[in-house]
Amino acid sequence: MPIQINKTVIFLMGPTASGKTNLAIKLSQQFKTRLISVDSALIYKGMNIGTAKPDKATLKKYPHYLINICSPESSYSVFDFIRDANKQIKTAFAKNELPILVGGTSFYFHVLEHGLSNLPESSTKSKEKFNQLLRNKGTIKLHQDLKKIDPQAANKIHPNDSQRIIRALEVFNLSGKTISELQGNKKPIIDYPIKKIILMPKRNELHTKIETRFLLMMKNGFLNEVQHLKQNPNLHQNLSSIRCVGYRQAWQYLNGKIDKTEMIEKIIIATRQLCKRQITWLKSEKYALVLNNSNLAKAVTFINS
């Protein structure tokens, strides 16, 4: 099988539980690749079971970059991702590797292809300031504050989306302009051709797999994983890491807010809702190879075309 040497970036996208990792590994057996994770949950250390992170043996044999790169209490912005992804893409080309960006965080893919607005960059001091504000006031109150400053942005951001809320407030604090004002004038982050592969199984298959996969997570010690996280005094339910699907609901259960049956039901429903949002976004993607299963032969032909 020929090695892809042209400077082309592969986007391997799909909703949660669609088999992206499996196909990425199969492609690594066909090409000299660099697998780069595009997943805002897989970045966190110690959050393995609930994020469906590839196991240690798999990661050792088929390294995935941008996995396990920060602690759950850390803040990791889209700017951090752009910096890290760009570095990995350049490294791939320097080593004559095919960069395959694989994951389910739609926003990250969108930014790499279409660019980001000319927003002021965050700093460690600024991040600390707004994370402290989040701890003191809570997500809902900060969303109300944002609505007074920038109602347009507030209407687009869910009241529980703490990361985007504090980023919008931070932008206003740093620039004196709202994030809505500054959005515009975008240019692509990636200057190379992009080939997109989208895994899109039937919805009923995804729903079944989501439930089966989560029940397996429970058997594999998901609650023990969350209990271990709760022992870290720096972690709380307003952090982006703990707001990941599954962890938020398990945190509520371990705090006695909901019972186990309700927790399981809430996690499965939330995961299916995430899946629906991902599918909606993926349907708007153009010029992509869409597969309803991990069809390796079609993917290889597409990459080589």
UniProtKB/Swiss-Prot annotation:
It catalyses: adenosine(37) in tRNA + dimethylallyl diphosphate = N(6)-dimethylallyladenosine(37) in tRNA + diphosphate. Residues 39-42, 163-167, 243-248 are annotated as: Interaction with substrate tRNA. Belongs to the IPP transferase family. HAMAP family: IPP_trans. The record marks T105 as: Interaction with substrate tRNA. PANTHER family: TRNA DIMETHYLALLYLTRANSFERASE (PTHR11088:SF60). One of its GO terms (biological process) is tRNA modification. Substrate binds at T16, A17, S18, G19, K20, T21. Monomer. One of its GO terms (molecular function) is tRNA dimethylallyltransferase activity. It is an enzyme of class 2 (transferase). Catalyzes the transfer of a dimethylallyl group onto the adenine at position 37 in tRNAs that read codons beginning with uridine, leading to the formation of N6-(dimethylallyl)adenosine (i(6)A). This is tRNA dimethylallyltransferase. SUPFAM superfamilies: P-loop containing nucleoside triphosphate hydrolases. It comes from the Bacteria. NCBIfam families: miaA. Its cofactor is Mg(2+). Its EC number is 2.5.1.75. ATP binds at G14, P15, T16, A17, S18, G19, K20, T21.
